[in-house]
Amino acid sequence: MANELPTNVSYGTVTGRYLLAYADSSDVGLNPDGIAAGGEILFTPLVERLRDATSTPPVTIIPKQVACTINVDGYLCGPDGLSSVRLLATDDADLDVVGWLWQVTYLLTDVEGSLIRGIPTHTMSLPGGTTVDLITIAPVAGLVG
């Protein structure tokens, strides 16, 4: 049985959508087709433990890696299946470490299930009570050529 974390712990929400651009198929339109990527995105906390001395009773929180999938429409889905994921906030003043980061690793696949490159691993902060769209914070790809 899962226990709730203390009520003074803050969270943020992460969203994102990932489509692969393929040549136009035999559909009605003439434009390239957008097909949902597959695979997963991993969120790894870059902190070993967080002490919440202000909760009753005090508690040590050990953040764990969170694996999210990409649904059939290309949206990031948390372990609960919803089109977003709630993670521990990195700026919670009730915890003894403020300003830690999440590492974001993209393991996206194409329609054949092969890993695709394109979005490098990066870090992110997640302020409490906010929604962060990964599309707006992922590193911009350089030109190839």
Over which residues does each language-model region extend?
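Extracellular beta-sheet/turn segments enriched in Thr/Pro/Gly and aliphatic residues
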Residues: 2-4, 124-145
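Beta-strand-dominated extracellular/periplasmic modules and repeats
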Residues: 2-122
